[in-house]
Amino acid sequence: MKKILITAGPTNEYIDEVMKITNMSTGRLGVELTKNYLKNGDLVTLIATRSVIRGGLFERYGLSSNPNLKIVPIETTDDMYKALEEEKGSYDLVIHSSAVGDYKPEFSFTMEAMAEELVKLISEGKVSYEDILNTLTNPNCKVNDDTKISSYEPNLTVKLTLTTKLISNLR
């Protein structure tokens, strides 16, 4: 009997409490692998998003009731990183079939608010490359993303940043 760790499906990176950046991964490969290893009598830990765990394929195979399956639900790349850190080291085989997002939202702003902030900066005589770059990368006009952002914001801009790279941390 082997101990297998499998990741499956997409990661979700939230812009606000309802909008997210994700990808088209269904998690099918990870679910199929999980099914086959469980059929062989192996112990499987599956790290996956709710969309995979609650998906029709997962239920059709009756995976949720298998005593040899440990499910670790995650949503974001950071969640997956933490789960992998907690689980790593005690497995015979690790299969990373998850489609992890490359970017996550850092903050949001409206073009109008950014234009006002830049005009103010220029009027104060702060027109150096460093001043402008600092304003663009850390503006005062950030939209509060702790709640739902209004769907009436015509010029909403989302600044993305890189997510944690997981493969190098698995080694």
Question: How does the language model describe each region?
Answer:
Residues 1-171:
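A cross-family phosphate/adenosyl-ligand binding-site feature
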